[in-house]
Amino acid sequence: MFCEKAMELIRELHRAPEGQLPAFNEDGLRQVLEEMKALYEQNQSDVNEAKSGGRSDLIPTIKFRHCSLLRNRRCTVAYLYDRLLRIRALRWEYGSVLPNALRFHMAAEEMEWFNNYKRSLATYMRSLGGDEGLDITQDMKPPKSLYIEVRCLKDYGEFEVDDGTSVLLKKNSQHFLPRWKCEQLIRQGVLEHILS
């Protein structure tokens, strides 16, 4: 059936939970592109035959194939665009270093796009706020307090706070730290916020 593979790509994204990135379906995308190539070649052949032979009975078939081509293109672009939006959101959620599990689900071109986006965002943040720049990825929601209590979920090592003091983050240790310094580690799964 026409457009079935393209619709399966869309269903695959729809089934993935929000904030999750399913594995890049290179095989499915290749099948859609092969179907589009076959439809285009059939249409070219029928258009040439309709022009030279005066066969107007081929026009509905040509239009149907053309509509299938357009639908396949829309689905393919929607699949790729939705993946880019999810990858962009991952940069804001996890920071500049993605976990291996997420990188494994990305195509090489998507990793390249992520790295370019990461560089562009870093350049923009350095251009704000004078010499030090401004990290706009922090405090996505306004904090209720400046310091929070956190528990370390795995051994991390030394962690330096702005005033120059160092804290040793060992598994199951608890600390009272500035919220904005902890948010990145919380997203990475190193720390968890202890709610009283």
Swiss-Prot record:
One GO-annotated biological process of the protein: DNA strand elongation involved in mitotic DNA replication
Induction (record text): Significantly up-regulated in aggressive melanomas.
Effect of C152Y: In IMD55; lower GINS1 protein levels and defective DNA replication are observed in patient cells
Any one Gene Ontology cellular component term annotated for this protein: nucleoplasm
Subunit description: Component of the GINS complex which is a heterotetramer of GINS1, GINS2, GINS3 and GINS4. Forms a stable subcomplex with GINS4. GINS complex interacts with DNA primase in vitro. Component of the CMG helicase complex, a hexameric ring of related MCM2-7 subunits stabilized by CDC45 and the tetrameric GINS complex.
Associated pathology: Immunodeficiency 55: An autosomal recessive primary immunodeficiency characterized by chronic neutropenia, natural killer cell deficiency, recurrent viral and bacterial infections, and intrauterine growth retardation. Postnatal growth retardation is present in most patients.
Name of the featured protein: DNA replication complex GINS protein PSF1
Higher taxonomy: Eukaryota, Metazoa, Chordata, Craniata, Vertebrata
Gene: GINS1
